[in-house]
């Protein structure tokens, strides 16, 4: 996925402008996280991956967001408010997904064992929990 597809959810048509992209990556914490999330997913060279992984790990601790870069999230990903967001790396998420602070998407044991698959156009409000397959 491309970062511009995610930024479109924040900025609309102006997301294609390089100045708007630059401004948001510098000053908007959720967009910084999404930018490095997408860059790390799409990086091919080992040196680039190591650098991006270091920055990504720093942002995870800084903003308290734990969405591993292995997580499959389609275009239109939006973090509404950052802080205490945890997602299982095996989760599959569809298009236009919004997530707020205090959310958890995790693995469950028992009858509904597994990891959730979340469809398109889903909004997870504050302090929501989705577990199981």
What do the predicted segments below correspond to?
Residues 1-63:
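Terminal amphipathic alpha-helical/low-complexity segments used for targeting or macromolecular assembly
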Residues 2, 16-18, 39, 72-75, ...:
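Context-gated lysine
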Residues 68-69, 74-75, 80-89, 94-95, ...:
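Left-handed beta-helix
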């Amino acid at each position: 996925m491309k970062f511009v597809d995610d930024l479109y959810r924040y900025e609309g048509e102006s997301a294609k402008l390089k100045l708007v992209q630059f401004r948001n990556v510098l000053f908007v914490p959720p967009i910084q996280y999404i930018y490095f999330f997408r860059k790390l997913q799409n990086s091919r060279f080992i040196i680039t991956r190591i650098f991006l992984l270091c920055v990504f790990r720093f942002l995870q601790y800084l903003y308290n967001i734990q969405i591993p870069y292995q997580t499959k999230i389609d275009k239109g990903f939006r973090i509404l408010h950052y802080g205490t967001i945890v997602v299982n790396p095996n989760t599959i998420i569809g298009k236009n997904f919004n997530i707020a602070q205090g959310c958890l998407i995790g693995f469950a044991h028992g009858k509904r064992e597994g990891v959730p698959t979340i469809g398109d156009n889903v909004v997870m409000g504050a302090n929501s929990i989705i577990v199981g397959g």
